[in-house]
Amino acid sequence: MNNYDVMMMKSEDIYKLMKILTNIGWKSIRETSINRIIYISAVLYSFRNPDESNIFKEDYMFTITLSGPEDPDIENALVNLESNDVIAQSEEGYKVSDNASFSFKAKQDLRKTEWFEDIAYIVGIYGEDKIYDFIFRDPEYREALQGNSIYNLNIGEDNTTVKFLNSFKMAFEEKLYNKEDALDNRKYLELYFEYIFGKILRGEK
């Protein structure tokens, strides 16, 4: 894709993500939050869908910053959306404009929209702070930060965080009460994060 197509694709991603977050009660969202949620969406996609190519891998290029993962194109997409009156900016962050109308040129992958809905569900349950704490404990992110290096974070199948999450996957699935019941993405991630937050974020062994 050329630069214009990339901007339009990310503009649509951000707009749809913001609409989803608005529907679960968010009044506004900061640029750092958008970067973080899309980053964790990308990482968890490979964890949950190990046999599929990551739908974010070719589109997003995150670098390490002190405020979290950042894709510089996201800022351009926000400017594009704001200039077309699709979103509005305030001191609290960005929000979807009333009666926003915008004609997107990119071909949107419905899997991405559905995945954003699943991730927003998890963020809605556990809250921003806990999810963001998880990001800052993200092995891929911490390795880059501690190495004092600026480089593109790996969001594909070989991501260090995916390997970290997979190391707990077998033990987690053994604890599921109804192993024969197929869990949808939301329920699986909800139970998995409950397990991970207990084992990792509270320092339990």
Each model region followed by its residue ranges:
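Domain-edge interaction signal
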Residues: 1-205
